[in-house]
Amino acid sequence: MEDGPSNNASCFRRLTECFLSPSLTDEKVKAYLSLHPQVLDEFVSESVSAETVEKWLKRKNNKAEDEPSPKEVSRYQDTNMQGVVYELNSYIEQRLDTGGDNHLLLYELSSIIRIATKADGFALYFLGECNNSLCVFTPPGMKEGQPRLIPAGPITQGTTISAYVAKSRKTLLVEDILGDERFPRGTGLESGTRIQSVLCLPIVTAIGDLIGILELYRHWGKEAFCLSHQEVATANLAWASVAIHQVQVCRGLAKQTELNDFLLDVSKTYFDNIVAIDSLLEHIMIYAKNLVNADRCALFQVDHKNKELYSDLFDIGEEKEGKPVFKKTKEIRFSIEKGIAGQVARTGEVLNIPDAYADPRFNREVDLYTGYTTRNILCMPIVSRGSVIGVVQMVNKISGSAFSKTDENNFKMFAVFCALALHCANMYHRIRHSECIYRVTMEKLSYHSICTSEEWQGLMHFNLPARICRDIELFHFDIGPFENMWPGIFVYMIHRSCGTSCFELEKLCRFIMSVKKNYRRVPYHNWKHAVTVAHCMYAILQNNNGLFTDLERKGLLIACLCHDLDHRGFSNSYLQKFDHPLAALYSTSTMEQHHFSQTVSILQLEGHNIFSTLSSSEYEQVLEIIRKAIIATDLALYFGNRKQLEEMYQTGSLNLHNQSHRDRVIGLMMTACDLCSVTKLWPVTKLTANDIYAEFWAEGDEMKKLGIQPIPMMDRDKRDEVPQGQLGFYNAVAIPCYTTLTQILPPTEPLLKACRDNLNQWEKVIRGEETAMWISGPATSKSTSEKPTRKVDD
């Protein structure tokens, strides 16, 4: 043990003296180590790890095994190859059946041909993406860190010999490539040794498809290839191509049998369990991926009415128990005019795209949405009764640069069955949709009824007191104390805003009283709230006279009165979370779409169609105004709408003559009216907040019964957090809403001022201060700087 350090020092001293010599060369080092092997032994034992030594031994053994015997070489030099063809066939079949890589298999066969032709080396090329370029194949482990297919250049003449052969598909034997002007770049290889003689052969399948190029070469000074070498190489490649084709045909037949078995299996699955249609679609998509060896799969259905493609089932690229996972998420839609899927849906043609981003038809929106990168696509239409009802899209071939013709043919047959499955799915969806409509309708009819003749006749003869006629013009007017007059207040507002002859009075009274009947007795979203919202819209229209058309004024006032029809006191998220039939009917803006549906239902009742005097085009217009206005009360849509309006206002691009801009402004007006309780006098605002939270807490109580913890806003156990919650609501929602509205419609500034006053009151509540406030006396919504004041206490 003590001799170790001195021996090591001696070893390294001798090595150091050797390596520091100014005339040191590789030959001198090798010569020195040959004469002093103990130095190498000492150096390796002390400085080289056991893993490295093991790697050297493995490489040496592999090299020895790779070198064939003269007898074995002679077998492959027989151009008839009867002695090895069956062995070759068996070898290829075994490799392919066990999932062997075609590229690696051809590389191994090329190595045999190199030995048989006594070449110094070879290069194997395969076609790149789009089949217009070549890539050099590098087997794994040969050069660590390098890809298996390295781009070598385009397929064209006037560059390299491999590109020339790929272009012409003819074998070339060149004795001296350096002197051949057809190949200015020679072989294009960097072998470290000058190449002189080259034998370059195309690798062609039995059906004539080019799959690669084999380039054999000999170094400078060696004997050039001759015709016999060409014959040996050609014979070997020909037999290899036939063998590969034969095995692939057998595999295709096996695949066909597997496909037939699968179709029978899916048929049984469908008829045994028709309810689980999503499971059926997943089953189909999983097999489609395996059929063409794709990385991702997507199935889009066609909405011919709106000319859109849509999907809610996505391949997220994960696996569970060896099977792909498909996730059902929020539905995405895009125009049928966009993308490769849209092209297939429009034309009904199959598209095989080897390079997606190089194709101008490719729609990158889906990649941006999912964060996935699409390289190549195989897209197939699903046709039923002569019409494209869906599109199946395979994305990114896993093994190979692109989807092949075989993939395309197999997929065509598979798409026929997809059409049957999708047709059945659509039929089942329509049945389910009808069942949901029926259940909701029966529930509604069991609760609601049409107004009596006494109710609407009493309204026809009602006259509003003069004092209320004055106060109704104020933005902060409170209808609360006048419950029996609410229907009459709405009739008055209609006549003041639209004229006394705008509707038949009898139909108008029937309509109003039936709308009242269809509001449920919930704490907040009730008949009182409907009239309050309608009054705020009335005040906005009156203070912006001449800005809106007669149809818009009629439609907006009716929309406000009906905007919460048949509200159950539960939020959209609650209905969707617990699979309420309404959520099945309307996937987005659930309650808002139901409110509009109820509005149309009342209009269709006998004697209730207040728009019956309009022309058909005007009738469609006013219904669309009402629909858009009611949908706009979905607070989830408000944030994006207000942001767009703010940007347009700041940039000066807002144009009220532009219909889309006008729709956005009306949407903001509807939100402002829906939230108008925050613009009333403080006592009214405070009482309304109590009603709102009573409804929230009732929903929270229901969630607790089901074992779900509600959000703090809906938890009555956290009522102490109400003032702080209101502060956040005012700052995040109400103040921005009325600020943007005031910018666009300046006469609505009193709404913003009142909202800020109430924000101050909530801040006082948080600080524990008195919340009495001074307000203006009887006045209009204009300046009140010289009006008498009065004190209002909570």
From Swiss-Prot:
What keyword terms does UniProt attach to this protein? Answer: Allosteric enzyme, cAMP, cAMP-binding, cGMP, cGMP-binding, Cytoplasm, Hydrolase, Metal-binding, Nucleotide-binding, Repeat
Give the location in the cell: Cytoplasm, Cytosol
Q: Which enzyme class?
A: hydrolase
The record's Gene Ontology biological-process terms are: cAMP catabolic process; cAMP-mediated signaling; cGMP catabolic process; negative regulation of cGMP-mediated signaling; regulation of adenylate cyclase-activating G protein-coupled receptor signaling pathway; regulation of cAMP/PKA signal transduction
For this protein, the activity regulation entry reads:
Inhibited by dipyridamole and moderately by IBMX, zaprinast and rolipram.
Q: Which family does it belong to?
A: Belongs to the cyclic nucleotide phosphodiesterase family.
- The protein's name in its UniProt record: cAMP and cAMP-inhibited cGMP 3',5'-cyclic phosphodiesterase 10A
Q: Which gene encodes it?
A: Pde10a
